[in-house]
Design a protein with these regions (language model features):
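Bacterial N-terminal signal peptides that target proteins for export
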Residues: 1-11
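Bacterial N-terminal signal peptides
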Residues: 9-21
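Intrinsic-disorder/low-complexity accessory segments
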Residues: 25-138, 145-166, 213-214, 221, ...
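Carboxylate/His-rich catalytic cores and anion/metal-binding grooves
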Residues: 148, 165-188
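Short, solvent-exposed turn/loop segments enriched in Gly/Ser/Thr/Pro and often Arg
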Residues: 171-175, 186, 241-249, 730
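Active-site-proximal cap/loop segments of hydrolase catalytic domains
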Residues: 179-204, 208, 224, 228, ...
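Core alpha/beta catalytic barrel or barrel-like domain that forms the active/cofactor pocket
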Residues: 196-217, 239-257
């Protein structure tokens, strides 16, 4: 027996030495990051590009069985987005089996005990890490190469152990397009006085920093690629989003976050986040890394960031490293160190920052070091708690399903009869994309004395993603939390309203009385739906009702393809259905059937097909020549406007403020659009607060404003028949005394009959925290074609308008007004009654020109589809006769 034991020990020792030898040989065959890039990632002044990073990871994939690189989607600019799976050789070879285990534990509440125990015994904790989504925050992606190399070559027992029990799913860069933009900018100005300058424009095709606000609406390609990981494909148990923050505060933030927290989230999620955060604090401080903070600044109340996964039962959190100027180090005096926001009241030793950083040089290499230690800590914690985390994931699945059976609401029902059928389709498809179980009703049912019809959409709450469904389908009520009893309220970090039905203008019914709709009465929706069918005749015209947002897409696309488009100038009726003024009539014939069919293929809702359209009275629609004003100061709202315009096939030309003086507006454009941007940035290329100007961090060629002559050029355009559309802070351009200089001798001074009261009302306590506010719209106005009488509009730090009796060649009409009561629909506001009877939108006339002002974002982050038509109709305003 002793001989047998000795033999086993001998064989085991030989096998271990063989494995270690093989690993060492493999490690020797793999280039280090320094050998591959020609510098150590994190070195001062050095950055690699996205393609270089992916090339290195592809080499690791080829050289090591511990890493597998998988393409998961495309960026908006068509770069491939990847996950690098990093784990033990055995785990990498068994990824398909482990993926099945993840799915079952995440989604199946009815696993029998024996199978559940088998899954928990065999499963691994999958940790999703998404890096540098904000491209100016270069550190996490620059650290990725070192982390990957270390994990695929290590022979350290501790790291081998945590790789055996966990799988690191590293998205090496969340925003490939932005990463290359930043690297290109940095290299362009490196070794010049502008080496530390900010990159002009947004570091993304469209949305820049707001890519971390898109995980409810999923508008962007890269957002959808990342969301699919935890919505539909891999169901990781843990997620970390790695960011950077300001220069002069703590060096690193780890969880838990500060209050307020989301109230629909299970307490266990917060507890696990706390465990990961506690271990991060212990491991990082133990490694000599100073300035690590927690329970500071960042809350976890609002969905929209990558951490939206916590509403899908993932233990999700973020980390934040103090920034440098891309790859250029900064020196921080001890007297410059400070804190702000929540959780730390001074830069001192605190339970939330037990070992402050003293100041001095701070380098990209420091950020890289912090990222390496934090990543290893997260993987170590995941592996050490493997069984408990896997068990908790399935327990939470069961718990959420049980809540759906026992606690209201029990269902959300979206009826097929909607004012905007295209938004009905979009909402249903979005929920399916989120991994929500959504069903068509197959037969009529009666619930609470109301008949619901076949084709209505049923969303049961008894499903694993119950928390998410409830969060995005209900209206929001902000949870009031105070710093001290009865003291100051903790203000929201971002927005406070995100209800998908309310933001899209879709009617949704919440069922709070316990009923059971048998699954035999339901048909699961597994693929995108549409409301399309083929006509049984060859149509000569398509009629698109203006109540559907998609009808504007049809009109703009049809015109671009050479089809004739008219807008109805008279209300009509077809088969008992009212067709409102402003609807679009598109005529077709045998010569353009190809274009017509291509048009229909891009839509989700059929038009009314017509054989005879001779009774319809309309005016021909021409595509306006649109100038879209976008500053160089990371103008996200303009980027979102570009996205909405591209989505609806609306052509435009981007005009920078510095180009106004030389732009022939009268000759080349019909409409000029000003998204939400500060007047001082637009006019002078400078930040301004009250009466104080601030130096910008952009190279001087990007800081030229409109200027006096450029603005005069715009005013001449207006006076001679141009249309200006403006919302948010840019409306300040058109307040107060204005001047048109027709010639050296002919100068006209005037004031438009509109005024902004926001400064006064805010001083009296008005506060709108990114909320949905009720407005009443004027009927029978071209700007409100297709709109319901009352809608919600999104307001955050917006102007508050009123009009006055006009003079000379001016006029005004109030398009939208805040009501006297029931002002707040969803979100949080203080003293919102001060809005009552104030104007939310105003149309103005000056000379032959028109101005449309919105005291809200009509297209906020591409998510407020309920008010899109106000913008689209404004683009199509006819000239004043």
């Amino acid at each position: 027996m002793l001989k047998l034991k000795l033999k086993i020990v001998f064989i085991s020792t030989v096998l271990f030495l063989f494995i270690v030898n093989s690993l060492a040989q493999t490690a020797n065959d793999i280039k280090t990051p320094t050998e591959f890039f020609g510098f150590q990632p994190g070195d001062d002044g050095m950055l690699f590009t996205y393609d270089e990073l992916i090339s290195y990871l592809k080499d690791l994939d080829q050289a090591s069985p511990r890493l597998k690189l998988v393409e998961i989607g495309k960026s908006p600019m068509e770069r491939s987005v990847y996950i690098a799976f990093i784990s033990s050789t055995e785990n990498i070879s068994n990824l398909n089996e482990l993926q099945i285990i993840n799915r079952e534990l995440a989604l199946n509440p009815n696993i029998n005990q024996e199978e559940r125990e088998k899954y928990i015994n065999q499963g691994k904790v999958f940790v999703l890490g998404t890096l540098s989504m904000h491209s100016g925050e270069v550190g996490p992606s620059q650290a990725a190469a070192i982390i990957a190399y270390d994990l695929v070559t290590t022979s350290e027992p501790e790291k081998l152990a945590f790789m055996n029990n966990s799988v690191y799913m590293m998205v090496p860069c969340h925003n490939p397009d932005g990463m290359d933009m930043i690297v290109e900018h940095y290299k362009k100005y490196k070794d010049t006085e502008y080496e530390r300058s900010s990159m002009p424009g947004v570091y993304h095709k469209y949305v820049g920093h707001d890519n971390n606000r898109d995980f409810v609406t999923l508008t962007q390609e890269d957002t959808r690629a990342i969301a699919r990981i935890y919505n539909q494909d891999w169901f990781p148990q843990v997620m970390v989003e790695k960011h950077q923050m300001g220069y002069t505060g703590p060096r690193y933030f780890v969880p838990p976050p500060h209050d307020p927290i989301a109230e629909n989230i299970d307490a266990g999620i917060w507890n696990w986040i706390g465990i990961f955060g506690s271990n991060l604090m212990t491991d990082m401080t133990g490694a000599g890394l100073k300035g690590v903070s927690q329970h500071y600044l960042f809350d976890d109340y609002w969905p929209g960031s990558t951490e939206t996964c916590i509403w899908k039962n993932v233990i999700g959190f973020l980390t934040e490293a103090a920034s440098v100027n891309y790859a250029s180090p900064i020196y921080i005096e001890p007297t410059e160190l400070m804190v702000y926001g929540k959780g730390l009241s001074e830069y001192k030793i605190s339970i939330n920052m037990p070992d402050p950083w003293p100041g001095g040089w701070w380098r990209l290499s420091d950020i890289v070091k912090y990222e390496i230690v934090s990543t290893n800590s997260i993987l170590k914690t995941a592996a050490a708690n493997r069984e408990e985390i896997l068990e908790y994931r399935n327990n939470l699945c069961k718990k959420e399903v049980e809540k759906g059976h026992t606690k209201p609401p029990y269902y959300y029902i979206i009826t097929k009869q909607q004012h905007d059928k295209s938004e009905f389709v979009e909402l249903v498809n979005l929920l399916v994309e989120h991994g929500v179980n959504v069903y068509f009703l197959k037969n009529n049912v009666k619930i609470n004395n109301r008949i619901f019809s076949d084709g209505d959409v049923i969303i049961p709450l008894a499903q694993p993603f119950r928390s998410f469904i409830k969060e995005v389908m209900e209206k929001q009520i902000y949870p009031l939390r105070h710093y001290t009893p009865d003291g100051e309220i903790i203000k929201p970090y971002d927005i406070t309203s995100w209800s998908l039905p309310l933001h899209r203008g879709v009617n949704s019914i919440e069922i709070n009385e316990k009923v059971i709709i048998p699954f035999s009465e339901l048909e699961k929706i597994s693929t995108p739906i549409d409301l399309k069918s083929k006509p049984n005749f060859d149509p000569n015209a398509f009629l698109f009702t203006v109540s559907n947002n998609e009808s504007f897409k049809a009109a703009f696309l049809a015109i671009s393809q050479g089809l004739n488009v008219e807008r109805l100038t008279k209300q009509t009726e077809i088969n008992g259905n009212e067709i409102p003024v402003g609807s679009f009539l598109i005529t077709v014939d045998k010569d353009n059937y190809g274009s017509a069919n291509n048009l229909l293929s891009k839509l989700s809702v059929d038009p009314i097909f017509l054989e005879d359209y001779s009774d319809f009275i309309g005016e021909k629609v021409e595509i306006p020549r649109i100038a879209l004003v976008e500053s160089n100061f990371h103008d996200m709202d303009a980027g979102w406007t570009r996205f909405v315009f591209d989505t609806y096939y609306i052509p435009y030309t981007v005009i920078k403020p510095g180009d106004f003086e030389k732009t022939a507006f009268v000759k080349n454009y019909d409409v000029v659009v000003f998204p939400n941007e500060d007047k001082s940035i637009l006019m002078e290329g400078k930040y301004k607060s009250e009466d104080t100007y601030y130096i910008t961090s952009y190279p001087p060629e990007y800081t030229k404003g409109i200027g006096v002559d450029g603005f005069n050029n715009l005013m001449i355009f207006l006076d001679q028949g141009g249309i200006i559309i403006s919302w948010g802070k840019s409306t300040e351009l058109f307040m107060g005394q204005l001047v048109i200089k027709h010639s050296e001798e002919d100068k006209e001074e005037f004031q438009l009959p509109v005024e902004d009261h926001s400064k006064k009302l805010k001083s009296e306590g008005l506060y709108i925290a990114g909320s949905l506010i009720n407005v009443t719209l004027t009927s029978d106005n071209p700007i409100t074609y297709g709109m319901e009488k009352e809608i919600g509009v999104f307001s955050k730090d917006m102007p508050i308008l009123s009009t006055s009796i006009p003079q000379f060649d001016m006029d005004r009409r109030v398009i939208a007004i805040f009501p006297e009561e029931d002002i707040l629909i969803s979100g949080y506001a203080e003293k919102e009654q001060k809005l009552k009877n104030k104007a939310a939108s105003v149309w103005l006339k000056k000379g032959k020109g028109q101005i449309v002002l919105f005291a809200f974002n009509p297209q906020f982050r591409g998510s407020t589809n309920v008010s899109f038509k106000l913008l689209f109709n404004s683009l199509l305003l006819k000239e004043i006769n």
